[in-house]
Amino acid sequence: MSVIWKDAIRSNAWPFIEAKKILDSLNGKVPEKGYVLFETGYGPSGLPHIGTFAENARVVMVQKAFEQLSDIPTKLICFSDDMDGLRKVPSNIPNPEMVAQYMDMPLTSIPDPFGECKSYGHYMNAKLCTFLDKFGFQYEFYSSTNCYKAGLFDDMLIRVLEKYDEIMALMLPTFREERKTTYAPFMPICPKTGKVLQVPIEKWDARAGTVSYKDEDGNDVEVPVTGGHCKLQWKPDFGMRWAALNVDYEMYGKDHLANSRLYSKICQILGGKPPVQFCYELFLDENGEKISKSRGNSISVDDWLKYASVESIALFMYKNPARAKRLFFDVIPKNVDEYITLNQKYHLEEDMVTRFANPVYHIHHGNVPKIETFGLTYSLLLNLTAVCNPSDKSVLWGFITKYEPKATPNTSTYLDHLAEFAIRYYHDFVQIHKSYLVVSEKHKIILYDILDMLSNITDQTEEENIQKAMYDIGMKAGYKNLRYYFKDLYQILLGQNEGPRFGTFIKLYGVEATKKLVEEKLYPVA
């Protein structure tokens, strides 16, 4: 066992834990197919959303962790269930009336409502691939339609016929009585309408490779199960795919957890070995409801990247994947600042166990760039933006270079992007919620004391000395809990409930500018 292997496992980082599970399941040996197969899934009923990014980002973290522990080659496939019948029309697409005419049709048989691709399914698949390519994911794309029609699943579909009774015995106890009478693992594609039919199967013939059902006119119809003439119900389809492709690792959301036993059992019935599995919790919107592609009630990845870097969103995905998290715009600043802190800690740390435990190791797959913000944070730049209301980042850079002469937009590109993001976020989310506290007589005394303090320091005064002086003023004012003192100051000076360390803020904004800010609150212009 190598030192890297030992340190990685000791780090207790969840990607390494998952990677070890895969290696253990293989007994450390190369699979017969010659590589370890990681799979992610995509339901193309709606546009790719942040959950799509999350699943792929997390699986790649495990894939890269596995590559640290083993020399066995790996492959990632992204599988699109584009042969599914349309069950409802998403609320966030154009031409919904047109799409509604194609209910129960395979997604790849519905005209593209956007007017750009061969079909609805092709459009969504193209969006997925563009989405994954944008973030540099290395994957192979698999289309359910192509797999069924090209015969990739034919052998397994015949095996489903051979194991029909065993699969039905597994599935039927999971349904209500009325569904038991109509359920069948196969869904024929209607030769007349092209719809995916959920009908009882009257007969099945493993030798002929066919199933029979009655159409809406009561006529017997016999169709082959191969060549794309049928598809499986989604639960048997999941297990069949694992067996057909010999998948070694799959992640899925909590909505699949209750059925995971069925997927695994069907895979075994068909002669396959179920993959190592990981269940992640779903994202919730700001109202605590599950995010949905068809409803479009989530932050898109593009939305996030309008206000922050991709590293911050990757950090959000890394943290506690088995815990449900609310996903709304308020989480962005915190994740940016946490990423900055973790990045700095990583490069100061020499112990490899601690480095392996740091999320940035997995976000960057072991190749962590070193960023320098000179002690400035996203939150601090937001607060600076709040008081100077800049139209562009050059205004912020005037304060930044005064605070740290070494920093320039050209040499500090991360900080330059941070300034741009902060201005955009402030104007879209902070400014509209500003609410200033009315200055009371008690507050006036505090503000006069702050003015006196500012008159006795310079821009060269140490941040800690300024911070201590601010603490002393709060204590003198009689605040038992200084949190309320600072909250009052934030509401008076910034119009918000939270804010920066004043020592750092005053150093960044400047003593004279801060004096002017305080004076504006003491002597408001009528």
Curated annotation (Swiss-Prot):
Q: In terms of domain of life, where is this protein from?
A: Bacteria
Read off the Gene3D superfamilies from this record. Answer: 1.10.10.350, HUPs
Where found, per UniProt?
A: Cytoplasm
Q: Name one GO molecular function term.
A: lysine-tRNA ligase activity
- EC number(s) for this protein? 6.1.1.6
- Record flagged with keyword Ligase: yes
The text of the family note is:
Belongs to the class-I aminoacyl-tRNA synthetase family.
What is the name attached to this protein's record? Lysine--tRNA ligase
Species whose genome carries this gene:
Rickettsia typhi (strain ATCC VR-144 / Wilmington)
